[in-house]
């Protein structure tokens, strides 16, 4: 598995805590089996249990679906975890869209990356961990020679991604039963 060479961090205050006691937010590529398991548990909780995607039941009832796919076994894929202090509570995944990337590859996939499976546990969403996770993924892909990254974003998160410098392209498309917007970011100025 490729590993980016830097760690990303930010601070945020927890409700009920003094602003003088910051919550340290960090993002790192998965390095241990325990971190990899935590990455997949968070994805399952958010996408299958909460959102009912990938064959799960919406609203936390059931949730027997599986959000894993062939990219999870790709040695070029980077699985990222986000922590609030020492608690793993967020994830994102990125991988190159090379000429052998199957249906994900376009006619000119060289230098293109895809970011997906961005998830933060509900009880931690108020901390703002999503932005450091996205920035970590963008920076990692850029440092590995990427020139463009794409992601398919749920409509509720389009403004958030635009705020982070992403641009919309095309119309909404269906993905796992929900509408998603294809968005792109130029990686050439991100390192």
Write out the residue ranges for each language-model feature:
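Short hydrophobic/aromatic beta-strand or adjacent loop that forms the aromatic wall/cage
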Residues: 75-79, 178-183
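Active-site rim helix/loop that mediates acceptor-substrate recognition in acyltransferases
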Residues: 40-88, 93
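Conserved active-site alpha-helix within GNAT-family acetyltransferase domains
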Residues: 143, 155-179
């Amino acid at each position: 598995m490729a590993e980016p060479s830097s760690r990303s961090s930010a601070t945020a205050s927890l409700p009920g805590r003094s602003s003088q006691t910051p919550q340290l937010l960090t993002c790192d590529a998965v390095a241990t089996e325990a971190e990899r398991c935590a990455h997949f548990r968070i994805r399952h909780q958010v996408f299958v249990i909460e959102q009912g995607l990938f064959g799960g039941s919406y609203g936390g009832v059931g949730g027997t679906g599986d959000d894993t796919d062939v990219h999870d076994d790709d040695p070029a894929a980077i699985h990222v975890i986000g922590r609030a202090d020492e608690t793993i509570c967020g994830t994102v995944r990125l991988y190159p869209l090379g000429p052998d990337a199957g249906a994900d590859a376009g006619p000119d996939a060289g230098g293109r990356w895809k970011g997906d499976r961005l998830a933060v546990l509900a009880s931690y969403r108020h901390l703002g961990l999503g932005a450091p996770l996205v920035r970590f993924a963008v920076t990692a892909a850029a440092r590995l020679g990427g020139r463009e990254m794409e992601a398919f974003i749920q409509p509720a998160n389009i403004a958030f991604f635009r705020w982070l410098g992403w641009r919309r392209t095309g119309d909404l498309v269906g993905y796992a039963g929900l509408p998603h917007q294809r968005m792109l970011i130029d990686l050439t100025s991100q390192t």
